[in-house]
Amino acid sequence: MKMILLGPPGSGKGTQAKMLSERLGIPQISTGDMLRAAVKEGTPMGVKAKAKMDAGALVPDEVVVGIVRERLVKDDCDKGFILDGFPRTLPQADALKQTLGDLKKDLDAVISLEVDNDAVVGRVAGRRTCRDCGKMYHVEFDAPAVADKCDKCGGQLFQRDDDKEETIRKRLDVYAQQTAPLIAYYRADGLLRDIDGMKDISGVQQQILSALGCGL
């Protein structure tokens, strides 16, 4: 199963991708995680990505496409993969189509998680991240036992710039302008599956599995 998860920031793509990866036995490919690793390491690619991420804008295509292509040629993608957070623009979608054609890997489905913008802001602005181990919490839905302290390692929790309300709303605007057209792009290809992302995690997962014909 070769698939893409689409949806605005905070729509639950990462959570659903992880669950699907475990259920289907295929890798989750999160461009967000790969980009953050490059930023943390201070690589040339990471420096370019950081400036855009801090401003709530999209990372340049040449950076993201290069990362994704390198990942898709690995052996664990032979039976399938889940792209989480890519593509985000029509040029990226075209580049992905060309890459998959070169690798003889055709997409099976594109899942689009539909959510309310205000709900997204509430989900994302409540996130807190451990400075030491990177474990994530939510002040409402998954709070640590002791405020601002990681349950796992005792490290200090903080709110990433990416998770602040002003940045989130900018990212949602960027999504609407540049990423939402992908829905029409993949609908025209007959690959799109619309999913109600406002249900609970289990409910969303059940919808996705049903749309993929995988059973419950």
UniProtKB/Swiss-Prot annotation:
Monomer. Catalyzes the reversible transfer of the terminal phosphate group between ATP and AMP. Plays an important role in cellular energy homeostasis and in adenine nucleotide metabolism. AMP binds at residues 31, 36, 57-59, 85-88, 92, 160, 171. This is Adenylate kinase. InterPro entries: Adenyl_kin_sub, Adenylat/UMP-CMP_kin, Adenylat_kinase_CS, Adenylate_kinase_lid-dom, P-loop_NTPase. The keyword Transport does not apply. Coiled coil: none annotated. Pfam families: ADK, ADK_lid. It is found in: Cytoplasm. Belongs to the adenylate kinase family. It comes from the Bacteria. GO terms for molecular function: adenylate kinase activity; ATP binding; zinc ion binding.
